[in-house]
């Protein structure tokens, strides 16, 4: 057996050989008191929210989610991740996320490939990195009006109130609620739609069990019942700083009957749980637990019965999906290894890296402006003694709530190139002996040119302005001269076919729209590329169209205020397959008319021959006159009473006109 699996294998053996518990009649004397973070810390991820709702809107074009976030004081940092899986090979529908906060937030947003529209208050939310999504300014409304504002744009799929979150995971397309309308209700379980981790760790308490000798310690985790009673698996990660070979810890897990446990521990431990449990190294091996008391006093009695002399951690949590326990010692003994050398600054000292990331760069009227808000500086506990450009004579102005540094492109040491104006922001901090420096840039938009090109092959060599239905087309967007400090991204594209064909969406929210639109790898110079396949399923086919794409130049590092958006377009000619002259792809019009006339002539000759044979083989006595009967009037009208449909088109549609 591998040595890495030996400790947990021993723990598994101990758990399976444990005796069933018996209740203690005597009162357990153990005064639970808060334990400092140096002795133990418990963090958790949960789907329980103070107020929330989940509703189903399967036919909605826009999936709407609303988050109300309450933070205690000052600016906070938040990680927000959106997850979505492809459905039938295509990206999910468009998403509107409404973000309402009560104070300043540094937001790290991850929504890769999701067609996201973000509504937020730009004066309170600061992105640590450019978001790369469509944004909308959120009006300053109370909660009820924000919900109404969001509902006007589409049925709300989920809404939740969270108190001081550190990270949020929002899963799209996972709504399992039975409601058709989302209305906030107290103490809700968001299920798989939303999980979040509170910033403040759970309250950890501990005590000494009287009358028990030895050094065995107990870690007790009590998970409280949630709003829903569906089966749940709680992953419990335990990390104890114990010497290898020690076997003096017991883990007691108590929860509702529908909760099972998946244990991931780095140390040999005796396991005592309700429900069923398994170990991470043997996830398929489920072990039946015991019936344990559901009160703190009863669980302390279990710990004493298991000969634990110390309750190192006692934690009560809402229904969680992941719980992490970190304890600095084991068995009641002090840690013998030397204390680790501190390599990161304490939380109450200034972080120069984060401070420099808060400098906002604005470019307008042939001038560069740097802005640094004092509120954010104070929250980081930084004391600034100076903010200048590379030229120290160009100093920032103190405008009450912010520092503002402004200069024309022709002064303060600006470096002007064909595509960019560059300088350096220099910040002097009281706690640092050397100044902090950061490169700042402005784009010279007068010198930039955006081009949209259509190609007939994936090699992008032969440019064209003609597309043919059923033939794949390749598109590339370029900016010249290239700007290495900025990233060129494709936000949206559509093909306008006029009143006959309407508009065909190709790309929305940086995601392919349809299963025959493919986002390709960028060119070696970083130019975005994609391909599409177009079919028409009614006639007549339009002869021209306009391909329009919206692109964005986003800084690889820095503020989203420097983003530049442009729309480029090109006129396209559309060749109908039956007029292309390529006989291998279909018969041209003269050939069709010739075949039709030939078939008519052959049919007429055969009919005449049959009539001649019939008339000459019958006896004269049986011949009867032929009476011509006029066809009903309705037959003539029915042959011409057909509907003429308008032209419709779609990327990769397989329908055809009968």
Curated annotation (Swiss-Prot):
Residues 26-337 are annotated as: Required for interaction with GDF2. Glycans are attached at residues 88, 102, 121, 134, 307. Residues 1-25 form the signal peptide. The keyword Cell membrane applies. Changing residue 52 to V: In HHT1; impairs protein folding; abolishes expression at the cell surface. Changing residue 282 to V: Loss of interaction with GDF2. Disulfide bonds join 30-207, 53-182, 242-330, 350-382, 363-442, 394-412, 493-549. Residues 626-639 have a biased composition (Low complexity). Residues 640-658 have a biased composition (Polar residues). It is found in: Cell membrane. Residues 26-46 are annotated as: OR1, N-terminal part. Residues 26-586 are extracellular. The keyword 4Fe-4S does not apply. Detected on umbilical veil endothelial cells. Detected in placenta (at protein level). Detected on endothelial cells. Changing residue 149 to C: In HHT1; impairs protein folding; nearly abolishes expression at the cell surface. PANTHER family: ENDOGLIN, ENDOGLIN/TGF-BETA RECEPTOR TYPE III. It is linked to Telangiectasia, hereditary hemorrhagic, 1: A multisystemic vascular dysplasia leading to dilation of permanent blood vessels and arteriovenous malformations of skin, mucosa, and viscera. The disease is characterized by recurrent epistaxis and gastro-intestinal hemorrhage. Visceral involvement includes arteriovenous malformations of the lung, liver, and brain. Vascular endothelium glycoprotein that plays an important role in the regulation of angiogenesis. Required for normal structure and integrity of adult vasculature. Regulates the migration of vascular endothelial cells. Required for normal extraembryonic angiogenesis and for embryonic heart development. May regulate endothelial cell shape changes in response to blood flow, which drive vascular remodeling and establishment of normal vascular morphology during angiogenesis. May play a critical role in the binding of endothelial cells to integrins and/or other RGD receptors. This is Endoglin. It comes from Homo sapiens.
């Amino acid at each position: 057996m591998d040595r890495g699996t030996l400790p947990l294998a021993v723990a598994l053996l101990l758990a399976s050989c444990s005796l069933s518990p018996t209740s203690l009649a005597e009162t357990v004397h153990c005064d639970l008191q808060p334990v400092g973070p140096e002795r133990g810390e418990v963090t958790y991820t949960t789907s329980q929210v103070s107020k929330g709702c989940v509703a189903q809107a399967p036919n909605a074009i826009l999936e709407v989610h609303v988050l109300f976030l309450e933070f205690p004081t000052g600016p906070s940092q938040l990680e927000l991740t959106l997850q979505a899986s492809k459905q039938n090979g295509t990206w999910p529908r468009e998403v509107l996320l409404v973000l309402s906060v009560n104070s300043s937030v540094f937001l790290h947003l991850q929504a890769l490939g999701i067609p996201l529209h973000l509504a937020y208050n730009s004066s309170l939310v600061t992105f640590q990195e450019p978001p790369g999504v469509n944004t909308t300014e959120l009006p300053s409304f109370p909660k009820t009006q924000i919900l109404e504002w969001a509902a006007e744009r589409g049925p709300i799929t989920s809404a939740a109130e969270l108190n001081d979150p550190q990270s949020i995971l929002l899963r799209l397309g996972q709504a399992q609620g039975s409601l058709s309308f989302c209305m906030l209700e107290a103490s809700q379980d968001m299920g798989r739609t939303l999980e979040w981790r509170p910033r403040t760790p759970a309250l950890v308490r501990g005590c000494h069990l009287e009358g028990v000798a030895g050094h065995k310690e107990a870690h007790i985790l009590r998970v409280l019942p949630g709003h829903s009673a569906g089966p749940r698996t709680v992953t419990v990660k335990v990390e104890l700083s114990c010497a290898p070979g020690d076997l003096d810890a017991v883990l007691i897990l108590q929860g509702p009957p529908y909760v099972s446990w998946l244990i991931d521990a780095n140390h040999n431990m005796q396991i005592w749980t309700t429900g069923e449990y398994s170990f991470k190294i043997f996830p398929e091996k489920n072990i039946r637990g015991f019936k344990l008391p559901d009160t703190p006093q009863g669980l302390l009695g279990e710990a004493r019965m298991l000969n634990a002399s110390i309750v190192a951690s006692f934690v009560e949590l809402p229904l969680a999906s992941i719980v992490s326990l970190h304890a600095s010692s084991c068995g009641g003994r002090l840690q013998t290894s030397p204390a680790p050398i501190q390599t990161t600054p304490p939380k109450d000292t200034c972080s120069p890296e984060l401070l420099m990331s808060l400098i906002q760069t604005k470019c307008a009227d042939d001038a560069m402006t740097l802005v640094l808000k004092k509120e954010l500086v104070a929250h980081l506990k930084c004391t600034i003694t100076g903010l200048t450009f590379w030229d120290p004579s160009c100093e920032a102005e103190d405008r009450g709530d912010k520092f503002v540094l402004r200069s024309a492109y022709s002064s303060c040491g600006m470096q002007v190139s064909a595509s960019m104006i560059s300088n350096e922001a220099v910040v002097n901090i009281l706690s640092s002996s050397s100044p902090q420096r950061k490169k700042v840039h402005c784009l010279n938009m007068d010198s930039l040119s955006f081009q949209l090109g259509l190609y007939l092959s994936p090699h992008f060599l032969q440019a064209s302005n003609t597309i043919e239905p059923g033939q794949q087309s390749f598109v590339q967007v370029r900016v010249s001269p290239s700007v290495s400090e900025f990233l060129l991204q494709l936000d949206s594209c559509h093909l306008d076919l006029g009143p006959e064909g309407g508009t065909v969406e190709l790309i929305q929210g940086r995601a392919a729209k349809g299963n025959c639109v493919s986002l390709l790898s960028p060119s070696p110079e970083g130019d975005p590329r994609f391909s599409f396949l177009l079919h028409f399923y009614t006639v007549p086919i339009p002869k021209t169209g306009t391909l329009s794409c919206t692109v964005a130049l986003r800084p690889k590092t820095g503020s989203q205020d420097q983003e530049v958006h442009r729309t480029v377009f090109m006129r396209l000619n559309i060749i109908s397959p039956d007029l292309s002259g390529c006989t291998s792809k279909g018969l041209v019009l003269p050939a069709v008319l010739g075949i039709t006339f030939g078939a008519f002539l052959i049919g007429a000759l055969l009919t005449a021959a049959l009539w001649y044979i019939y008339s000459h083989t019958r006896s004269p006595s049986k011949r009867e006159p032929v009476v011509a009967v006029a066809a009903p009037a309705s037959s003539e009208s029915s042959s011409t009473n057909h509907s003429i449909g308008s032209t419709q088109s779609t990327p990769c549609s397989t329908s055809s006109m009968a």
